[in-house]
A protein has these predicted regions:
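Hydrophobic/aromatic-enriched cytosolic interaction surfaces used to assemble or bind macromolecules
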Residues: 1-171
Length: 171
């Protein structure tokens, strides 16, 4: 399954997008400076329920400023070992403290990495406000990372998905 909503987290605010056949439709945005952030997010959540009564399940879009993007020349058969070697030492965090995705395109290895703690904070925020987060992604400029980096499932995803469902990534 692909999540029917995306919660776009930025340093200025939160946007909720609904998946439509042609891509994504903006449901609404809330400023982080909103007088009553919780109430404003509640309105977004209720609007989502009216738009799509099948249930709200979101992918969390992590701000690009929280992601380390690396591009390195590589051989055509690069794999996990090359990704970890390229990441090692580029952040103050241990490799096991990072979630990352990578793609190989034309001999160039594109890597996107984010601190797991950041993902946990985003998940907790979305859970507190009832947005049912199932996965983590980013939406960088295509020169940084071709496609949509996928940082995996949320810790709560198994509770939000049907037993037979898996989350499919957008490419």
């Amino acid at each position: 399954m692909k999540p029917n909503f995306a919660l776009n987290l930025t340093f200025d605010g939160i946007g909720l997008l609904h998946r439509v056949p042609s891509g994504w439709h903006l449901v609404g945005e809330v400023s982080l400076e909103a007088e009553d952030l919780g109430a404003a997010l509640n309105v977004l959540r209720k609007t989502a329920a009216q738009i799509d009564p099948s249930g709200l399940r979101t992918k969390l879009v992590i701000p690009n400023e929280q992601i380390k993007f690396i591009t390195v020349a590589s051989h055509p058969h690069a794999g996990e070992a090359e990704v970890r070697a390229a990441l090692d030492g580029t952040t103050p965090y241990a490799l096991d403290d990072l979630a990352y995705d990578w793609t190989l395109e034309g001999g160039v290895l594109h890597i996107a990495a984010v601190v797991r703690e950041t993902l946990g904070e985003a998940e907790n925020f979305a859970l507190i406000h009832g947005f049912n987060p199932v996965s983590f992604v980013a939406t960088p400029d295509q020169s940084l990372f071709p496609g949509e980096p996928f940082f995996g499932l949320t810790a709560c995803a198994p509770d939000l998905l049907k037993h037979t469902e898996t989350v499919a990534r957008d490419l």
